[in-house]
Amino acid sequence: MIRLRAQQLINPDFTDVKDVVAWMGAIQAQQPRMAKLALGIRTRGATMQQIKQALDRGEILRTHVLRPTWHYVSPNDIRWMLKLSCNRLKSAYASLMKGHGLTITEQMYDTANQHIYDMLSGGKSLTKEQITERIAEKGLPSDTIFMNRFLENAECEALICSGPEAGNTHTYMLLDERVAPMPLPTKDEALSKLARNYFRSHAPATLDDFCWWSGLSVKEARLGVEIIEKELQKVVLNDKTYLLHDSSSIDIKEKESFIFLPAYDEYIIAYKYRGDVLQVSHNSKAFTNNGIFFPLILQNGRATGNWKMTLTRRNIAVNTSYFDNDTPTDLSAAEEKARLQLISFHN
């Protein structure tokens, strides 16, 4: 229950989605609809429309940071997080290209950056497809592999970030036209900020968990933890050393909870060891070996099944399946309450 509370999954503190993102540090945003729901279940009274508006206004941003995948981040954090992550991200991108037997030279990246800057300058926002068409016109490689790298590199170098959605499609804008430049912390300050953000919102968690979530080396992660050690308490459980942040709520009144957890949610994906909340024998029903994560049913903080949502214009249908094949008969009221919350969120 402590982790549920830290993650804002029970008794959420915030009514504004931008405050949730700032609290969490970063929220994985692989699948846009599921990622918005991840914000919604952590924000009191939030709706899908409110979250879309926050994205459109630039109050939260979607970009590749930390690990080389999509995350929602706060405008106040995006620059220092990118600076902390950039070298590792570039190394990961180079490895991906090498795996395809391809390379991108620095000159190609610089040329792509200039073209992207020119086409977005003046407050414009464009989709990936629109940028791809213009890159192709300039004579650069424009297939999916190259465009992914060009755009990810431009994000990494703090050239671009998310713009207002075009319908439900992600767009890009120049970061400098979306977020005012601001002083950057030193590396030690950035490490401590990232450690504080993680442990206050994900505790109890281990150093290995923090390494996994942040993409930092063990040395960097340990330094970040050491800098804020006065804010942390150590708890040993099952031969693992967990860290609790001073802000962690120990006295939690809630005894029971039932949550439809989105795919790729921080409650599962943000930890290297997931056995605390997911029985190992059920791993294959929660995620695949190549990193696809499924929506889960959480009962009292433990994953007990899967759920699938079907949206129509008038209703939301939810199909559930439980890992132990015996659908609990006493959960109909809990399921219906969670379904009504989904309806309220989708407005």
Descriptions of predicted regions:
Residues 107-124, 187-203, 225:
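Positively charged, polyanion-binding regions of nucleic-acid-associated proteins
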Residues 231-281:
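Non-catalytic regulatory appendages
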Residues 1-126, 133-137, 141, 280:
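Phosphate-backbone binding and catalysis cores of DNA-processing enzymes
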Residues 144-222:
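Loop-centered beta-sheet repeat module
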Residues 58-65, 69-70, 155-165, 229-237, ...:
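A short, conserved structural fragment
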Residues 280, 286-347:
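Glycine-rich, small/acidic residue-mixed loop/short-helix segments
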Residues 203-252:
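Anionic-ligand-binding alpha/beta catalytic cores of soluble enzymes and soluble regulatory domains
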Residues 54, 127-136, 154, 207-211, ...:
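A short acidic, leucine-rich amphipathic alpha-helix
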